[in-house]
């Protein structure tokens, strides 16, 4: 009995010693467990923005306190790409086997102007049609359509990077509805539901045969995750008033299209 108690205390001390670096280290770590499979710690977006710079006529880099950076690349006055690879990767096309493409040959349109302001605890990036606002203390993004002066979407949580998975969280409005995702058999409007972005080769009810990583919102924006990886879009099914978007990729690469017409939101 005494030997069992001694072994128990020894194991407890070892677990505490292993847990200490996880509790106090600021960097993303992998928790060590007694099993052969590691538990992956969640790596959230940096909490603060330290600088912003325009690197070419259409592209802006935002630098965070952990030296990671997010790139905003404008494909027109109302279309922008948001990219972040914490492993140091640069803007690129997603890999596909067999080889495939998502964008058309000439996806860019003229950007009439690109203005950057960094003051009052906020970074503001403005074109002739949209305004992007980033809170410097949280890095949360809010986007306004300057034609209607309406906030079309805003983040409610920082971007989350897990091993092999990236998650975006947006606010859902009570009168907002969502459509798209490709062929989602038996479903048309996705409010209050979750849809899988994966080819299940199923033509039955609730099956997926031709998914697309794109949806549009009646609030005035279209969204496309620039990837061929599987994903899941949750439009308030798990958490009310919350849109949770995720794909099985370790970097962020998405397009937003801001427009007050349905046709405009459906074009990249």
What are these regions (language model features)?
Residues 15-17, 43:
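Residues marking helix boundaries in flexible regions
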Residues 10-12, 23, 86:
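Compositionally biased, intrinsically disordered low-complexity segments enriched
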Residues 31-265:
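N-terminal accessory segment at the very beginning of proteins
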Residues 3-15:
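Bacterial N-terminal signal peptides that target proteins for export
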Residues 17-25:
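Bacterial N-terminal signal peptides
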